[in-house]
């Protein structure tokens, strides 16, 4: 379930960046493309995408600071999406000051 949700979220964010699609349209397109039908995976991916997009500017600033002198927009779309989702899941959905290394290993 976790792998499907992350795959769906990464692909959705990539479609949004590449084609400028809205979140609902990109999500629906990705669900159809990947053929994911697990309701838990769909629900979790939807939350990941929505919350990541909502905080995108702050997340990008955080990532840009971490990868300086490079910038997030210098990476491929899939890596950009993964980094944004990873920062959201490790910094926003949990206590900001305590990185969860076990979860990081599970996601990767």
Model-predicted regions and their roles:
Residues 1-108:
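Class I Rossmann-like S-adenosyl-L-methionine
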């Amino acid at each position: 379930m976790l792998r499907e949700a992350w795959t769906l979220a990464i692909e959705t964010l990539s479609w949004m960046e590449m084609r400028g699609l809205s979140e609902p349209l990109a999500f629906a397109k990705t669900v159809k493309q990947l053929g994911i039908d697990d309701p838990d995976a769909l629900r979790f991916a939807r939350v990941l995408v929505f919350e990541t997009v909502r905080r995108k500017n702050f997340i990008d600033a955080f990532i840009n600071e971490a990868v300086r002198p490079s910038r997030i927009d210098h990476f491929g779309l899939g890596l950009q999406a993964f980094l944004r989702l990873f920062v959201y899941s490790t910094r926003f959905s949990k206590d900001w000051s305590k990185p969860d290394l076990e979860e990081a290993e599970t996601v990767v």
